Swiss-Prot record:
Gene3D superfamilies: Bira Bifunctional Protein, Domain 2. Transmembrane segments: none annotated. This is ATP phosphoribosyltransferase regulatory subunit. Keywords: Amino-acid biosynthesis, Cytoplasm, Histidine biosynthesis. It comes from Pseudomonas fluorescens (strain SBW25). The lineage of its organism: Bacteria, Pseudomonadati, Pseudomonadota, Gammaproteobacteria, Pseudomonadales. The gene is hisZ.
Amino acid sequence: MATVDRWLLPDGIEEVLPPEAARIEVARRQVLDLFQSWGYEFVVTPHIEYLESLLTGAGQDLDLRTFKVIDPQSGRQMGFRADITPQVARIDAHTLRREGPSRLCYAGSVLHAQPRALSSSRSPIQLGAELYGDASPSSDVEVISLMLAMLQLADVPDVHMDLGHVGIYRGLARAAGLSGEVEQQLFDALQRKAIDEVIALTEGVPADLAGMLRALVNLCGGREVLVAARERLANAPAPVLAALDDVLAIAEQLSARFPQLPLYFDLGELRGYHYHTGVVFAVFVPGVGQAIAQGGRYDDIGADFGRARPATGFSTDLKTLVTLGRAEVELPSGGIWMPDSTDAALWQQVCQLRSEGQRVVQALPGQPLAAAREADCDRQLILQNGLWQVSPLAS
């Protein structure tokens, strides 16, 4: 094996060095403190699980992103987590089994066999929050507000948010009686805004429903889209109209809370269609080709764990958040150099300094004082009149 092969990392797998690792850790603590202040409880999920459990309730895309191995003890197939959200849903549905609303949050590394997008990380640090047990738009507003508060805390500039609802397309597709195959083909065409394909796929659909399905291609833009949708979808089935009401109610509350937030509506955007059941949302910033935070409602996931519960939440990549954010992360700087000594009084003094939050670095045998600078120390402990004193590091 060539020397270069010993340190070469796989594509999309990164190591994080100081001081960037310290910035990420400080940001993680700050965000989790923010979540806690909103009533969200922190949970830790396993890095690896049996595949049947890990992929329960998840879509095919998660299966493709999951690294798989064989457990040498049981012989069963296992997977490294590629998404923490289903694990947290299991905790709520199967482990906690609370009757009322439950608020949970998490932060941890995930591993992707396939990157989400070109040049994206395959080892992001997923961070998110989930609210279970309430089906009202108020829950969606809460988690979206928390997501935006997180972005404000990180001082991510120029954010804008996309808002949609998978129930609009799903309600129209079911009313039209589309087969699973045609529904999937139409879904793909809508994502590409391929109007000719949409028209062709809806040829055999009753005229009113065909017109509404085709209208989804162009129902994207600012607040005027909701007005146009009310007109174009006026004769839609009741679930579709209820979904429109939810989008409008959520948009109004968000605009009241975040008046400077640009809102963009795309009623044909079906991000997470096979996973989400209601409102879907994503945050974008200029110059980044994919969402930096996203989420939505996924009410059906708990059923696979024996207990269906309404659910809504969001997630982001902590490393991306730190990279894009302008918030100043205060890192400890400087330190105190402790000489190589077995003096008991010195040790007691060092313990006291560390208990006060001071950073103390011990010299190892043979290390010169010049090594203190490399250890980012600006002070030293010296013995004066029988007492160990902290003094500026000699130049």
